[in-house]
């Protein structure tokens, strides 16, 4: 792998990098008012409104105005059909869902995502929030629906493509710095150097940091100590203070881009390197509602708190009406370290006026290690986990793009290789309620050791993926109907192999490693028809199939392979502009059907919440939805935009055979008065000791959307602009379900009272900017003041089932929930030259 990296770097020193840049004109989704945005959603340049599929393009101005600084800021409701949630509250590790579908356990090291994430044509299998921070985006394209015919493996639900700004060859730059509450500060810079011997060079850098969102209780016993990690682990915690405020972030990185033309050959090379330290915050708890429903077990009206027997540590349930400002006891702060770097080489040759040949090569490495408290945040009995995930990828793609009047075709082939090293461990923090020697200070009752170990659960596994594919997509305009009809067909052949091997289980090196393999050998088609009703009014119909690779669950003790899944999508859409392109209205209606769905399931949350199993669901997952994008420019100075998504996904009930985690569909299940699932006597007899679960849809809020307004006015020689938006998302589930019904006896269901809370979002954001400030010497600037979550709404980002003791100190089924950020505000200064 290093040899390939050196080869690329050497090549770039000789002839550096990239195809002719695709220039998106300055505009925003909030109201481009007739300006054409050029996108490459079909691997060739097209006007956004002419692309026969659902695409949203966010320009650089839009990203800055809406405060989108990293992938996590895309947020649920900001883009139709896209749901984004931070895993366990992290700002760096995120999960992407598109049109009600994603990944049920996105933090697994070896499970592929359902939404592909691309940076300048290179697939990032582990989406990193820093990827957006390190580049100056020309635009972000969000493609909804299966994109496998052109964007490759694991784009079954959709794809996100970041297109960076190319080096200009002229001396210029963009420098921003800002400060906000929670001691937030950032500096971001991009400099284009003057062209030298035909080489155009761009340098970028970023530094971003903020303090924690909650005040921790300082504890000298958690300072200047070392957290436990297995002797077999590839990393060990340093001696440090582990009573820091939760919710902190510290990140920095740099990027270099070099471009040169050699006649008709364009060469573009980039290298980026990033580092970030984040944590997973402080988990609150919420209780199951008193009245049970089909989605949750019945709770109660008892006191909502958890505590140890002596009452030394007590935590009340989350108050949804008030954002917490502190934790109720000394909380163990456990950080994660994220490192990543990568090379990209893009060659483009204009063979003639109709044919362009491209080569896109990528080498990347990412590393994430650290730990977290999981389940309920009470120090008296708190599970914790550590993980180490090292991913190395290499990809090589070749493209031939041919176009004439009435006919366009893209041919391509791609090879992708990834190796993963994944280590995981589970342990417990200090438990002062139990007589464990050395864990508590007798006088204060405070913890004296951060973690102790009840049993060694350390696991180490390796995964190797090799994927090869060839694809073709062609569009043809027949000489009928005044050339208003365009027909498109695409086909992709994929041959993938994923091998997994476990060498350590529960702290013991295995004499014979566990191993499994998942293989894929398949064809996936796509068909589209577009008809132009008028110059600015198009309708289209689309069918596409996508798939996601199988693999092995690194969290599972069973370590059995799960198989690939497929998604069939049927879509009808309208793309239109009215009133001299002052009003844009796009509508898409779709139905997705997932077969052989990969589903993760918490194995035993009360013993070890980090353990999950993954299996293929035998019943189909179906989602029907409508997406609406409306933007208008009533006056040259005012832009308005609305987007709305409606999703309806089916609730399924399946059984899991004991020991094998093979699933089966239930026949004629019923429900009791509290909504608990009761399997039929026939299912119980046919599957003794099976577990029965209900699978709710993940990343599928029934309603989501946003309303935004942008206004500007001149003030002397300056330009004053304002942006205000309301982003709303209804309830959605984001974590693996638990077994809600177990141990059926004589046809009677005994509910297992676990509760998994949904999360939602309700945020108002704003920004006021004074621009066109001239500093002389060609330097211009702007000063902005901004606020996010202005009304300090309490919104969740991640939640999972964690408590069902039903004791006097824990009287109700409970769920752990990590919160989105509270109200943040600040100002920044931007200089351009």
Question: Model regions: which residues?
Answer:
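N-terminal Sec signal peptide and the immediately downstream disordered periplasmic leader
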Residues: 1-77, 349, 831
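N-terminal periplasmic accessory domains that precede
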Residues: 36, 72, 95-97, 118, ...
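Short acidic/polar hinge/loop motifs at secondary-structure boundaries
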Residues: 84, 107, 114-146
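Transmembrane beta-barrel wall of Gram-negative outer-membrane proteins
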Residues: 172, 179-287, 339-345, 392, ...
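Outer-membrane beta-barrel domain signature, strongest for Gram-negative TonB-dependent receptors
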Residues: 237-244, 249-410, 416-419, 584-585
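Membrane-embedded beta-barrel scaffold of Gram-negative outer-membrane proteins
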Residues: 346-350, 356-362, 367-372, 532, ...
């Amino acid at each position: 792998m290093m040899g390939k990296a050196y080869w690329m770097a050497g090549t770039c020193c000789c002839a550096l990098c990239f195809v002719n840049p695709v220039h998106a004109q300055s505009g925003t989704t909030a109201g481009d008012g007739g300006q054409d945005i050029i996108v490459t959603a079909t691997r060739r340049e097209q006007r956004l409104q002419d692309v026969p599929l659902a695409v949203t393009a966010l320009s650089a101005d839009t990203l800055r105005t809406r405060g989108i600084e990293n992938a996590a800021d895309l947020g649920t409701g900001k883009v139709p059909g896209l749901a984004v949630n931070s895993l366990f509250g992290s700002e760096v590790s995120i999960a992407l869902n598109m049109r009600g579908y994603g990944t049920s356990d996105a933090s697994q090291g070896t499970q592929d995502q359902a939404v592909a994430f691309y940076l300048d044509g290179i697939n990032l299998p582990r989406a990193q929030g820093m990827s957006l921070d390190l580049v100056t985006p020309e635009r972000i394209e969000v493609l909804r629906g299966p994109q496998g015919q052109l964007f490759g493996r694991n784009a079954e639900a959709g794809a996100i493509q970041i297109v960076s700004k190319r080096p200009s060859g002229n001396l210029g730059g963009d420098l921003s710095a800002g400060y906000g509450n929670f001691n937030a500060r950032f500096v971001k810079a991009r400099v284009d150097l003057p062209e030298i011997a035909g080489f155009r060079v761009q340098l970028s850098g970023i530094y971003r940091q903020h303090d924690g969102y909650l005040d921790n209780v300082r504890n000298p016993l958690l300072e200047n100590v070392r957290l436990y990690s297995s002797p077999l682990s590839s990393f060990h915690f340093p001696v440090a203070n582990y009573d820091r405020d939760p919710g902190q972030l510290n990140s920095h990185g740099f990027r270099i881009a070099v471009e040169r033309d050699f006649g008709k050959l364009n060469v573009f090379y980039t290298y980026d390197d990033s580092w970030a330290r984040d944590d997973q915050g402080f988990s609150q708890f919420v209780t199951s509602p008193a009245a049970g429903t089909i989605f949750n077990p019945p709770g109660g009206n008892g006191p909502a708190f958890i505590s140890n027997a002596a009452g030394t540590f007590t935590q009340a349930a989350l108050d949804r009406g008030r954002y917490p400002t502190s934790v109720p006891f000394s909380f163990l702060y456990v950080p994660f370290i994220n490192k990543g770097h990568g090379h990209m080489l893009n060659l483009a040759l204009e063979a003639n006026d109709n044919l362009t040949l491209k080569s896109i090569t990528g080498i990347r490495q990412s590393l994430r290690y650290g730990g977290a408290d999981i389940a309920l945040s009470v120090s008296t009995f708190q599970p914790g986990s550590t993980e180490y995930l090292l991913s190395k990828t290499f990809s090589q793609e070749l493209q031939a793009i041919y176009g004439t009047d009435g006919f366009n075709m893209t041919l391509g082939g791609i090879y992708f290789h990834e190796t993963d090293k994944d280590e995981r461990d589970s342990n417990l923090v200090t438990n002062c309620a139990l007589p464990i020697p050395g864990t508590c200070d007798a006088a204060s009752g405070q913890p004296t050791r951060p973690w102790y170990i009840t049993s060694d659960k350390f696991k180490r596994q390796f995964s190797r993926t090799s994927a090869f594919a060839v694809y073709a997509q062609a569009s043809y305009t027949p000489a009928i109907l005044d050339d208003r009809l365009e027909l498109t067909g695409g086909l992709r052949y994929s041959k993938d192999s994923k091998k997994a091997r476990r060498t350590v289980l529960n702290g013991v090196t295995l004499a014979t490693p566990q191993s499994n393999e998942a293989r894929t050998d398949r064809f996936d088609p796509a068909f589209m028809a577009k008809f132009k009703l008028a110059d600015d009014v198009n309708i289209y119909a689309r069918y596409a199939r996508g798939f996601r690779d199988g693999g092995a669950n690194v969290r599972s003790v069973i370590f059995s392979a799960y198989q690939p899944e497929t998604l069939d999508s049927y879509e009808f859409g309208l793309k239109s502009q009215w009133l001299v392109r002052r009003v844009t209205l796009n509508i898409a209606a779709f139905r997705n059907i997932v077969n052989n769905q990969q589903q993760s399931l918490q194995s035993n949350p009360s013993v070890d919440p980090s353990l999950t199993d993954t299996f293929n669901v035998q019943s189909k997952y179906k989602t029907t939805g409508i997406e609406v994008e409306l933007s208008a420019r009533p006056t040259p100075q005012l832009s308005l935009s609305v987007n709305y998504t409606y999703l309806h996904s089916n609730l399924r009930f399946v059984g899991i055979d004991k020991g094998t985690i093979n699933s089966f569909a239930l026949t004629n299940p019923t429900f009791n008065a509290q909504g608990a699932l009761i399997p039929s006597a026939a299912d119980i007899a046919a599957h003794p000791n099976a577990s029965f679960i209900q699978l709710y849809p993940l990343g599928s809020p029934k309603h989501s959307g946003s309303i935004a307004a942008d206004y500007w006015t001149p003030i002397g020689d300056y330009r004053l602009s304002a942006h205000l938006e309301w982003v709303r998302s209804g309830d959605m589930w984001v974590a693996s379900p638990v077994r809600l019904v177990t141990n059926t006896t004589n046809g009677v269901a005994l509910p297992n009272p676990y509760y998994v809370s949904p999360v939602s979002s309700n945020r108002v954001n704003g920004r006021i900017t004074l621009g066109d400030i001239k500093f002389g010497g060609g330097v211009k600037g702007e000063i902005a003041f901004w606020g996010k979550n202005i009304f300090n709404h309490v919104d969740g980002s991640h939640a999972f089932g964690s408590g069902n003791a039903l004791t006097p100190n824990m009287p109700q089924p409970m769920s752990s929930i990590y919160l989105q950020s509270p109200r943040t505000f600040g100002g920044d200064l931007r200089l351009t030259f």
